[in-house]
């Protein structure tokens, strides 16, 4: 029987066993984990589930803990704990300064402006699905046949249950790192085997092993100034993440193209 956790286990195993959690920052929409090796990762989080622990209190549990052990929370069904796990995973991988020898180094392109604009030429004239309703899709939508799948649909969106029917017909599919948190990523990859799958957003794990699982591109965040990004998260200013030390990056198979 296929192990549904295989991709998760591979990512968690990629986290160095020697690194520890140095700091934890919790905002209204995003959280941040910093390792004692200098790596920083962020992830989106969600309203606490009924009866679940307040995720803001997790700092008292994870400070000084092995980064890999905290990354194991990515498999939790408490989605806020899973967000903490994803941020820990990203702290190990989404960094240029910490691992200059990493495959991430030659594969990174700086992405000015809207990340979706980077894919405009690729998407022109194609059937495109986006998992989740995001700002900045207006320009891209003018160049392709786009459908948006959303758990809480806005006018013109499709409900997320439509994925089983529409994703196998798409040329390009955009997903975010939150699909790791809510455990939909495994099924989404099964439904998109004939499409190009791009993972986008600050929660994206920038690890090349994802290319073996069907991803064509990874667009995420590298934190160059931990203090600046921490201030933005505490002030609940998502746009300020990118103005205060968050660098948009893109990783392609085999390096920059």
Residue map of PLM features:
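Feature captures the catalytic cores and cofactor-binding loops of soluble hydro-lyases/lyases
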Residues: 163, 179-213
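Conserved mixed alpha/beta catalytic, RNA-binding, or beta-rich assembly cores of soluble enzyme
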Residues: 84-87, 93-94, 127-166, 176
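C-terminal functional extensions of proteins
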Residues: 197-257
